[in-house]
UniProtKB/Swiss-Prot annotation:
Species of origin: Mycobacterium tuberculosis (strain ATCC 25618 / H37Rv)
Disulfide bonds: 73-109
Protein name (database record): Anti-sigma-F factor antagonist RsfA
Keywords: Disulfide bond, Transcription, Transcription regulation
Leader sequence segment: none
Upper lineage: Bacteria, Bacillati, Actinomycetota, Actinomycetes, Mycobacteriales
Gene name per UniProt: rsfA
Length: 128
């Protein structure tokens, strides 16, 4: 998997996790499906890190969580850690979820400032 390539592709990241990586100008969008838990945390971390590296400031890294059936705390921690790293180089990490519980969890964990949650990919891309 090479998220620096132009276009969009789907890759089975693990048995429980699938992801589509899409380039939108200099932004990168991850569409995650399935489950993220301790069993595939390192795979998730590798995917997020590579996608972040392929994102060019000032465009964002957008992570669409709408296709997830389960997201463990470890997945949120990976996103928060990468958001802090991205912020240092001028890249925002923006989440997409229609599930209000996701925003509540992000805020309860204290990550609301670094992981804003948007209702659509389009709104995440256009946010300032």
């Amino acid at each position: 998997m090479n998220p620096t390539q132009a276009g969009s592709f789907t890759t089975p990241v693990s048995n429980a996790l699938k992801a589509t990586i899409q380039h939108h100008d200099s932004a990168v969008i991850i569409h995650a499906r399935g489950e993220i838990d301790a069993a595939n945390e390192h795979t998730w971390q590798d995917l997020v890190t590579k996608a972040a590296a392929a994102t060019t400031a000032p465009e964002p890294l957008v992570v669409n969580l709408n296709g997830l059936d389960f997201m463990g705390c470890c997945a949120v921690a990976v996103l928060a850690h990468e958001a802090e790293r991205c912020r240092r180089r001028g890249v925002d990490v923006r989440l997409v979820s229609r599930d209000r519980a996701v925003a509540r969890i992000i805020h309860a964990c204290g990550y609301g400032d670094v992981l804003p949650v948007h209702p659509t990919t389009e709104s995440a891309l256009s946010a300032t």
